[in-house]
Design a protein with these regions (language model features):
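Conserved pre-motif C helix in the palm subdomain of viral-like polymerases
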Residues: 1-7, 96, 127, 133, ...
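Active-site palm subdomain of RNA-directed nucleic acid polymerases
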Residues: 1-22, 139
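Hydrophobic packing residues in well-ordered alpha-helices of helical domains and bundles
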Residues: 11-14, 28-35, 49, 101, ...
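Catalytic palm subdomain of template-directed nucleic-acid polymerases
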Residues: 18-43
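Short, conserved micro-motifs composed of acidic
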Residues: 27, 36, 40, 48-82
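Hydrophobic, well-ordered secondary-structure elements that form the walls
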Residues: 42, 56, 136, 166, ...
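Basic, alpha-helical interaction scaffolds
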Residues: 75-145
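Short linear motifs embedded in intrinsically disordered, charge-biased segments
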Residues: 154-238
Length: 238
């Protein structure tokens, strides 16, 4: 992670996937010098930017949204999209993750067919459960600590229906996604607290009692269901 001047821009790079995150305030409508500097750095280091695959996703919850300024890379306009898949998760411009859930459910149903085929060979429940955990549960739980609590009841039921179907096929009750997600959130939060240099550690502030963490003030339901508030509520639970 690399923070730009003023703390308003942040570069995140995982392997060859690079994301520029900009916090625009007031009348700001572009990435400032951060994008220009990044393009120049790529040119200086003989790296080609594929403009056709470079997208811009604008997340703005204000009632009066500013008109986005068109970004130009080497005289080519960057396409503005309403959803984008980054590191295996589909983000939309309202952070509802319903599109991501639909994609997961579709792929999960395809893998249920494979589980049924495997069951038709009369293999042991141990092998069926191993297949489920490796190919289906891993799909349902990928990055879900970031988005599961933000889902609507309908989307949660769609995911849980896959778990219920797989439980019937394997003959073994598979773990509930809500319980599994809460356990993973606590595990992730513990990892953040144990790391002195983690960027999110400052979000966990201990109350004067020394036994509980201060819950951030959440003005929206969306913020309340995000990772940090959810993690603090679980850590404070008796």
């Amino acid at each position: 992670m690399q923070e730009q001047s003023g703390g308003q821009q942040l570069f995140g790079q995982i392997s060859d996937d690079t994301a520029l995150l900009s916090l625009l305030q007031g009348s700001e409508s572009d990435h400032g010098n951060a994008l220009t500097d990044f393009i120049s750095w790529c040119d200086d280091n003989f790296l080609d930017l594929n403009v056709s695959k470079t997208k811009e996703l604008i997340i703005d919850f204000r009632r009066n949204r500013n008109t986005a300024k068109e970004c130009i890379i080497h005289k080519e306009s960057m396409e503005i999209v309403t959803s984008y898949k980054y590191l295996g998760t589909i983000f939309d411009d309202h952070l509802k993750f319903d599109i991501n859930t639909e994609a997961i459910v579709k792929r999960g149903q395809q893998r249920i067919h494979l589980l049924r085929k495997l069951n038709s060979f009369s293999v042991s429940p141990v092998i069926l459960c191993s297949f489920y955990q490796s190919f289906i549960e891993s799909l349902l739980s990928f990055s879900f600590i970031c988005w599961f609590h933000s889902l609507t009841v309908k989307d949660r039921n769609s995911l849980n229906s896959i778990v219920n179907i797989c439980s019937k096929i394997t003959g073994v009750k598979q773990r509930d996604l809500n319980y599994f997600c809460n356990r993973q959130i606590i595990k992730k939060a513990a990892g953040i607290l144990a790391s002195s240099g983690h960027v999110l550690k400052s979000e966990f502030s201990v109350l004067p009692s020394g036994r509980r963490y201060a819950l951030p003030a959440c003005r929206t339901n969306r913020h309340s269901k995000s990772f940090i508030p959810s993690a603090i509520r679980l850590l404070n639970a008796p």
